[in-house]
Amino acid sequence: ALALGPLMYEFGWEINDLDLLGAGTICGHLLECGAQVTGSYFADPGFKDVPDLANVGFPIVEFSKDGTFIITKPVNTGGLVSKATVTEQLLYETHDPSNYLVPDVTADMTNLELEDDGANRVIVRGGKGKKPPEKLKATICCDNGFMGEAEMSYAGPNALARAKLAGEVISKRIETLGLQGQLRVEIIGAGSVHFSHDEESSYNLPENGDYRVRTSGIYPLKHQAQQLVDEVMSLYCCGPSAGGGGRGYVTPQSSTASILVDRKTVDPNIRVKIF
């Protein structure tokens, strides 16, 4: 919307100019994550190198009235604009490229053409649009208890075994306390992104190293989450040898759910204040 609105105003597009609205929406999709289209998140050293990422430039769009536009970035900035960076961002969070749903139009990316226009300049043309969806997306938020989260590090000889033991101790103590919640125990350095609370996750990892046990749990009541944190902190004196760097905290949690509502039930109300 932050791209499509100004384009409609500047070029005098009407709400039934569906192909133009589709092109403007695709432009907004490319811009919505900022520097991702100029090389951030794209970068993968040795495979997809991006120069001077620390000084990455944010994207600039040069838009024509016919729906064609150019993606570029400021001069003397790092990053990269190429057909590859644009393609990755086009597909980012896109479930169906032929039906990209926003309230004003259903954008169609399947006929897009990308063309290099010199260094760090890519032409995008061929955006299409179809009638807008009959239903709108709404996000519902509600309270969902409290998360207790705490960590403890183990380093040096036999560190992995000590970290595993710490995780087992915490799991058993939480069970003894009778805390009913969503408990997760993982070992950072041994597979925290891929859940590490099993033997297979640490296969072929060095026993001597630097590992950090992270424990988290979501509970209905704040004091229950605090109990989890306290148990992890107790590992200093009541856990495996030489734990250190402990920290923990409790935070309130919210859950979200997405639903579809009939657009006829939504009455837009816009208020603009000029300061």
Segments (PLM) and residue ranges:
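An acidic, phosphate/nucleotide-engaging active-site surface
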Residues: 1
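A glycine- and small-aliphatic-rich helix-loop capping segment at beta-alpha/alpha-beta transitions
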Residues: 6-18
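Structural signal for hydrophobic packing residues in well-ordered secondary-structure cores
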Residues: 11-12, 30-38, 65-68, 87-102, ...
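Compositionally biased, low-complexity repeat tracts
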Residues: 18-20, 63, 205, 235
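A conserved active-site cap/scaffold subdomain adjacent to cofactor or substrate pockets
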Residues: 20-131, 147
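C-terminal non-catalytic interaction/assembly regions of soluble proteins
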Residues: 125-275
